[in-house]
Amino acid sequence: MTGSIRSKLSAIDVRQLGTVDYRTAWQLQRELADARVAGGADTLLLLEHPAVYTAGRRTETHERPIDGTPVVGTDRGGKITWHGPGQLVGYPIIGLAEPLDVVNYVRRLEESLIQVCADLGLHAGRVDGRSGVWLPGRPARKVAAIGVRVSRATTLHGFALNCDCDLAAFTAIVPCGISDAAVTSLSAELGRTVTVDEVRATVAAAVCAALDGVLPVGDRVPSHAVPSPL
């Protein structure tokens, strides 16, 4: 056990929601973050969004949709991505322990989703210099994206795991600003339909275990993954 990254000992309040508008979920995150700063519980929201593109703070103009599709600007890290049906989105609203280690927090989120993939029979891992969870190949294929914000020692935003989503939605953008890699889903990799509901409970358990140190962070890099350019 590597120890919890959370400043609170009580269990994480996991909320399994349905389909929630992106802006509505964003407002809920802010309200929960305010409550957490005031001494409230750590919370994990698990949900789906109606189809929407969201742009992190580092998104450049040429990475936006080529057809002029509207984009919601956010205050998370990272660049542009897509959310929509068939994708499980997780928003941990967590008070981090001192000293703050955001990289360690991101690694724990990655580890939880790597474990979910392993439970399904997929050998996923990391690509050096890039966040998220990847499947090996040339090019490597991203199955889960991560983009977070930490304010007042409290986390917002989180991760998106592609279960059975429309991968064509990613073709209108440069996903996460990475042009030399591909995007995939659990269904595409396994050759069967993997619904959001199938993995909800597994994801919730893995995220809580990783944040509490029960699931240690490993050095998992998929073979034949393409390293990031220097």
Swiss-Prot record:
Return the Pfam families for the record.
LplA-B_cat
Reactions catalysed, semicolon-separated, are: octanoyl-[ACP] + L-lysyl-[protein] = N(6)-octanoyl-L-lysyl-[protein] + holo-[ACP] + H(+)
The record's section on Gene3D superfamilies has: Bira Bifunctional Protein, Domain 2
Q: Where in the cell is it found?
A: Cytoplasm
InterPro entries in the cross-refs = aa-tRNA-synth_II/BPL/LPL (IPR045864), BPL_LPL_catalytic (IPR004143), Octanoyltransferase (IPR000544), Octanoyltransferase_CS (IPR020605)
**What's any GO biological process attached to this entry?**
protein modification process
Q: Which GO terms describe its molecular function?
A: lipoyl(octanoyl) transferase activity
Q: What is its EC number?
A: 2.3.1.181
Pathway it works in: Protein modification; protein lipoylation via endogenous pathway; protein N(6)-(lipoyl)lysine from octanoyl-[acyl-carrier-protein]: step 1/2
Site (described: Lowers pKa of active site Cys): K142
List cellular component terms (GO): cytoplasm
Q: What is its main location?
A: cytoplasm
- The BPL/LPL catalytic domain sits at 38-215
Q: Which UniProt keywords apply?
A: Acyltransferase, Cytoplasm, Transferase
For the ligand (substrate), the binding residues are: R76, G77, G78, K79, I80, T81, W82, H83, A145, I146, G147, G158, F159, A160
**PROSITE patterns according to UniProt:** BPL_LPL_CATALYTIC (PS51733), LIPB (PS01313)
Q: Which residues form the active site?
A: C176 (acyl-thioester intermediate)
Task: Provide the top EC class.
Answer: transferase
SUPFAM superfamilies per the UniProt record, alphabetical:
Class II aaRS and biotin synthetases
Outline what the protein does: Catalyzes the transfer of endogenously produced octanoic acid from octanoyl-acyl-carrier-protein onto the lipoyl domains of lipoate-dependent enzymes. Lipoyl-ACP can also act as a substrate although octanoyl-ACP is likely to be the physiological substrate.
More details = In the reaction, the free carboxyl group of octanoic acid is attached via an amide linkage to the epsilon-amino group of a specific lysine residue of lipoyl domains of lipoate-dependent enzymes.
Family as reported in the entry's similarity comment: Belongs to the LipB family.
Q: Please give the HAMAP family that the UniProt record associates with this protein.
A: LipB
Protein name stated in the entry? Octanoyltransferase
